[in-house]
């Protein structure tokens, strides 16, 4: 115990918001790395068709899970973060989740003909099991997250993903294919639920109709807004699976996952900020939320911009060597998706802010318009030009969503950007891009090792330039170092 205290005490000396941001950042980075490496292995071990079947399983799971959740997850995080009658609200949401299990059983039985493509993949039974386990995992995760245990929640998320990947790698190696992938997904949720429950402070307590009304008044709009977000995440996957081959699903989802490297800082910032912004709003401290927004955008672009530049310059070779020749054929789609992730920085933060500021209705309105347009464009473009049509549809409608969210959010708080910080990020990224471009002109990228060199060189050059140009980021690192104990 003493050794653990010695190890953790420097970290605990860091100011809480910084500490939670760092824990979230590093766990998200670790999750991203684990996800990328495992997907690379699966791409070579089982190919794009098996991966496509697994991605369809995930698409249906997340779609059905949203329906069965009904917005309860977001609502309970919101109500618990406000700090009023938290046990009663948690219990009310948990009981509703249990009741929805019965509804899920009935819906899946009647929906078997609709789920024909996933039935052919042999993972329909895994889907049913995953939905049941997901209810308990979501309850524990949302309970800890709403209680402000952001670092713990991220750690459990890491355990979920890491356990999932370890199980999947072993199962794929033993030849279980898509069943091993689906089984690993469920195993990860079980492991994270057990550990997260150990630290859950919330308890089952009698609730009344008032608590249900409080949850549903918020969950209804969260459900509708989440439905819109889900369209951006999985509608294209399901539509590609309907019009094209399962292999095309595998290629598209791998490309999409690869580009999400640009937004892991956005995910980290949003995860940390949501309960904070919710609390600031409840206490009338909107100025704190305004300052955090400008910082959130800057720190989100910190990675998104250089990843975009590097992806455009090296994307075709990275896809070829990391995943295989069939995935490299989607390079043009990959470039479009890189732009999508830049837009996603603003859309993600702005819609998160609308929900945290107790404006789920506004969040739904802006997302619903874009989501409807996304489905229409998917049906128009995917049958004609393939997976690049899905990427173009996502780019157009996500830009629309971001703009509409901006118009709604600026009526609530004052939106400011740190133009100096953004300028420094752009300058460092451009110079990095020139350096990487010169390397590619001079050195043929004939193998994976020659491809990794410009990636590492570009990263080092970018970090050096950014720390040289931006005193705020440099001072932030120095401050964290002092709080840890480095002088």
Outline where the language-model segments fall.
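Alpha-helical transmembrane segments of multi-pass membrane proteins
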Residues: 63, 67, 98, 102-106, ...
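Membrane-proximal transmembrane or re-entrant/amphipathic helices at the cytosolic face
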Residues: 2-10, 437-487
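Helix-terminus/linker motif at the lipid-water interface of multi-pass membrane proteins
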Residues: 36-50, 230-262, 279-280, 316-326, ...
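Membrane-water interface segments that mark the loop-to-transmembrane alpha-helix transition
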Residues: 20, 24-31, 57-116, 121-125, ...
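Signature of the first transmembrane helix
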Residues: 4, 13-73, 101-109, 130, ...
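Interhelical loop/hinge segments that connect adjacent transmembrane helices in multipass membrane
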Residues: 4-13, 175-185, 194-233, 276, ...
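Specific pore-lining/lateral-gate transmembrane helices of multi-pass inner-membrane transport
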Residues: 79-94, 251-359, 363
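Hydrophobic alpha-helical transmembrane segments
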Residues: 124, 156-202, 218, 256-259, ...
């Amino acid at each position: 115990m003493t050794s653990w205290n010695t190890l953790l005490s420097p970290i605990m000396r860091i100011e809480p918001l910084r500490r939670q941001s760092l824990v979230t950042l590093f766990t998200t980075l670790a999750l991203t790395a684990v996800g990328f490496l495992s997907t690379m292995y699966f791409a070579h071990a089982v190919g794009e068709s098996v991966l496509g079947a697994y991605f369809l399983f995930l698409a249906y799971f997340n779609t059905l899970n949203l329906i069965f959740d009904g917005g309860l997850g977001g609502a309970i995080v919101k109500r618990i973060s406000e700090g009023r009658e938290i046990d009663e609200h948690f219990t009310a949401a948990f009981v509703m989740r249990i009741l929805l299990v019965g509804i899920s059983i009935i819906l899946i039985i009647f929906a078997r003909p609709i789920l024909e493509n996933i039935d052919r993949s042999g993972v329909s039974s895994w889907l049913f099991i995953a939905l049941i386990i997901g209810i308990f995992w979501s309850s524990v995760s949302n309970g800890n997250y709403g209680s402000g245990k952001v670092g713990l929640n991220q750690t459990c998320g890491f355990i979920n993903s890491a356990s999932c990947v370890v199980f999947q790698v072993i199962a794929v190696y033993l030849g279980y294919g898509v069943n091993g992938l689906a089984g690993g997904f469920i195993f990860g949720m079980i492991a994270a639920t057990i550990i997260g429950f150990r630290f859950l402070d919330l308890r089952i307590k009698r609730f009344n109709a008032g608590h249900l009304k409080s949850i549903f008044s918020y969950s209804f709009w969260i459900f509708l807004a989440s439905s819109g977000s889900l369209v951006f995440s999985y509608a294209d996957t399901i539509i590609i699976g309907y019009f094209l081959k399962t292999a095309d699903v595998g290629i598209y989802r791998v490309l999409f996952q690869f580009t999400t490297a640009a937004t892991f800082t956005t995910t980290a910032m949003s995860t940390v900020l949501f309960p904070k912004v919710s609390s600031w709003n409840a206490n009338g401290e909107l100025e704190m939320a305004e300052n955090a927004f400008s910082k959130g955008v800057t720190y989100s672009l910190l990675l998104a911009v250089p990843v975009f530049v590097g992806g455009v310059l090296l994307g075709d070779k990275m896809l070829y060597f990391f995943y295989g020749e069939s995935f490299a054929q989607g390079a043009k789609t990959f470039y479009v998706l890189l732009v999508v992730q830049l837009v996603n920085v603003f859309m993600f933060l702005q819609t998160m802010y609308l929900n945290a500021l107790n404006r789920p209705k506004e969040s739904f309105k802006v997302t619903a318009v874009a989501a409807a347009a996304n489905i229409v464009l998917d049906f128009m473009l995917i049958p004609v030009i393939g997976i690049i049509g899905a990427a173009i549809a996502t780019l157009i409608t996500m830009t629309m969503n971001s703009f509409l969210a901006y118009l709604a959010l600026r009526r609530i708080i004052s939106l400011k950007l740190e133009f100096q910080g953004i300028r420094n990020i752009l300058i460092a990224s451009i110079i990095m891009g020139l350096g990487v471009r010169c390397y590619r002109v001079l050195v043929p990228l004939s193998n994976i090792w020659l491809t990794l060199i410009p990636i590492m060189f570009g990263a080092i050059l970018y970090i050096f330039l950014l720390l040289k140009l931006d005193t705020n980021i440099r001072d932030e690192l120095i401050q964290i170092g002092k709080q840890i104990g480095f002088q």
